[in-house]
Structures are given as structure tokens and as C-alpha cells.
Swiss-Prot record:
Taxonomic lineage of the native organism: Eukaryota, Viridiplantae, Streptophyta, Embryophyta, Tracheophyta
Organism: Panax ginseng (Korean ginseng)
Reactions performed catalytically: 2 (2E,6E)-farnesyl diphosphate + NADH + H(+) = squalene + 2 diphosphate + NAD(+); 2 (2E,6E)-farnesyl diphosphate + NADPH + H(+) = squalene + 2 diphosphate + NADP(+)
One Pfam family hit: SQS_PSY
Similarity remark: Belongs to the phytoene/squalene synthase family.
GO biological process, alphabetically ordered: farnesyl diphosphate metabolic process; isoprenoid biosynthetic process; response to jasmonic acid
Protein name stated in the entry: Squalene synthase 2
Function: Component of the triterpene saponins (e.g. ginsenosides or panaxosides) and phytosterols biosynthetic pathways. Catalyzes the biosynthesis of squalene.
Amino acid sequence: MGSLGAILKHPDDFYPLLKLKIAARHAEKQIPSEPHWAFCYSMLHKVSRSFGLVIQQLGPQLRDAVCIFYLVLRALDTVEDDTSISTEVKVPILMAFHRHIYDNDWHFSCGTKEYKVLMDEFHHVSNAFLDLGSGYKEAIEDITMRMGAGMAKFICKEVETIDDYDEYCHYVAGLVGLGLSKLFHASGAEDLATDSLSNSMGLFLQKTNIIRDYLEDINEIPKSRMFWPRQIWSKYVDKLEDLKYEENSGKAVQCLNDMVTNALLHVEDCLKYMSDLRDPAIFRFCAIPQIMSIGTLALCYNNIQVFRGVVKMRRGLTAKVIDRTNTMSDVYGAFFDFSCMLKSKVDNNDPNATKTLSRLEAIQKICKNSGALTTKRKSYIIENESGYNSTLIVILFIILAILYAYLSSNLPNSL
């Protein structure tokens, strides 16, 4: 669960964290017995625990298809991200990856830790892929082909303009949105969403990741990964790596805020996409990552720590998002709360303040007009959660132990 300090500071994180831990244990027990499927679901939980939990709620056939889709694209991403692979080797692999998924003898050793295991044992993913229905296989092959070609293009091309940035994000994430929409439609659970809305779902997530991961990407060895567009960062510094130096802190934060403001462009499309979903499990699967993204942007905005270390939502807040997100009203409430948090951090002296505030106010207007912002709802913004004395701490841990014992025996399927 979360760290002791974080739990004591945010005691209402206890119950969601407890439910999340129990759900994780339950998900691990549901791993299939067939070797290739056992590998795939075990690997899914290793590379993304939260994604692994949400995916478990989907229907069996769709769950299998989304699991394989995710692992195939993680493998493709592992090849792209490994800066030790020469361009001459990397580009042909990316271009041919959609054919490799049909070959259960193919593997390519690269990446580190669990990603290296995924690549070394890729035949398990291929075998599971071949088990899928034809509609699922066709959708996965098509997106893998297009993504591999797009990644190959940007191996040899820098992200210069905002149009380049949008194009790169389309290849690595917008296509994921298109692919998931195709899988949802193939399952019979949803109408086929437009490419434009599907693309925005992916771009919002990807741009958030690119913003949050600046320091990790710029410090990559043997070669930096640079995804922030020159058109934005060149307004503030001469070289992208200059943003991490303390003497450029003021300019770095202004550049960061410019990047966040750009990402906010996609929120209205994302809200429209989610409001059109009918299946409750698919809805949760799509909505939880989007809320995590707006929450992460709220943390990153105007925060110099993006250039100093890791900025991410605490585990307890993540658990709350997973626990509370069930309906579109919950989504509107979360986006309103996090946009309020972000708005409170806007400095009127920031060069993009007017643009940032305009985009946040447009998001807040949509949320207000939805009618979802009732006084009874639970807010993600709590003014004061500190000041608990030692007696209360002891009581809270007793309650925690009782809840854990109760939920372990009575709520194995809850999140």
C-alpha cells in the first residue's frame, strides 16, 4: 500500500488502498493455466499493475484481446525506447513488427528488467495472439503496422514543430486509441468511435507522459530521448537539456506550463468520447487513465520538480480514482476538481496564463453544464487532512486491520 507518512497525512486513502490491494491479490489468482496466457497476464501485471487491474473487469474475449494488444505495443515500444540499438537494426524491426507477431519463433533481446523478459519470451505473446478471433487479430495487426512505421519515421526525424509533436503522439498513442475503439466495436459492446475522438484519447495520455518523464528521457543513456517540440522549448532555452539546469528554473517552469497548456487542448474530445460509451467495464477502463492524466498535469503544472525528479500522483489518490470512477458524473467531478487545482496554480505573470485559464474554464464549463457537480459528491480537493494525534493513529491501524480481514473474506471481487 502507500507509505506510512502518506497514509497518516491522508487517512481517507486507507479504504481505497485496502480495496486496491485485495483486488490486486484477486487478479493475480485469476491468471489462466495455459502457459502462453499465464505468461501474458503475469507480464501484464508486472509492466502495469493498475492497467492489469482495470483490464480484469472486461469481458473474457475482449480482455484477452486488450491484454495482447497492450503487450504487443509494449514490445514495440521497448524496441523504440532502447537507445543502445543502432538505427540500422531498429528501423527494420519496427517496420516488420506486425509480421513478427504471427511468428511464434521470433524474439529479439533488448530492453531491461521485465521488458527484457517480454522480448526474450515473445513467443508466448505470439501464441496468445494467434488464439484471438480474426476481427481482433486484424485490428491489432493494422495498428501495429501503422505504429511501427510511424516510430521508424521519428527515429530519423526530430520533433521540431507542434505538428510534428501531434504526429509523433498520434503514432505512439493516438493509434492505440483507434485500435481500442476497433476492439470495443469488434466485441459488439460499443459503436465505432470517430478517429478524431479516439486519437485525442491517446494524445492526452501520451502528452501527459512526455511532460512528466522529461528528466528520465533527457538523462537516458547512451542517448537522450527528446519529445518536447522545438517550437515550444526554443522560446525559453537554446537546448532542450538546458531546462534541467538550476540557473534556468524560471524559464523551465514557463516552458513546462506551455506544454501542459498544449495538452489541455484534448480534454473536450476525451470527455465527449467517454460520454458516448455504453458498457460500464469499458467505460471504467477508458476513464480511469484519463482522470489520472488530468491529475498528473495538475501536479506537474508550475512545478520545478518535473526537472529535478519524479512527479506522480500518490498511490492513495490513484486508489481513490479507481474506487470512485463508475459513471460519467464521476468523470466530470474529477476533471472539475483537478482543473480547479491546476487553475489555482496559474501565475498571471506566466506568458501563457491567459491561454491556460481559457482552456481550463472551457473544461470547467462542460463539467458544470453536465449537472454532475452536486454537493453530495466526494471531492478530490480536501483542505486539511493533517493533525492526527498518536491515539487516532493507533485507532486507524486497528480499523485497517479489521477492514483488511473483513474484505479478504467477503469482498474478493471488489476494487
